[in-house]
């Protein structure tokens, strides 16, 4: 059974999804390419302990503070995507890393000389639990604020909320509808 709930954030409404193990999805409902991707029609709206934890986490986060805990998460995906998600959860509040840095971490773990930053980008881009699994903290090697499921302007807003110096980043001059 899939459960859903909503949260109204300063950046727009957020859809929460989960199963009996924990939170499986968190998406902005407007302007997001992946909102509810894979949710079944029989998903049931309800309250759960992990939705309560998630709403508490989001409330602290949107007040500009590091929540200091994670709600109960259930990462659903391939081993590679889940490992990328775990690494993203280790990126400190107010810090950023590059796709290449994550690729280097995975290459070291697997005893490889190199790992594709593009493969990491694909995994980051399919992160179903935005904000909490902080894909917004992953940037291009040249400082570009590359794709974000909730839109580049939301990615920028989240990084600003965390106190990042935005002068170090480049924002695309052409922002399409999917990036707003």
Residue ranges of predicted features:
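Compact structured core domains
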Residues: 20-70
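Nucleic acid-binding interface residues in structured DNA/RNA-binding domains
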Residues: 3-10, 56, 65-177
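A sequence-level detector of short linear motifs
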Residues: 15-16, 25, 98, 147
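DNA-contacting interfaces and partner/effector-binding or oligomerization modules
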Residues: 1-24
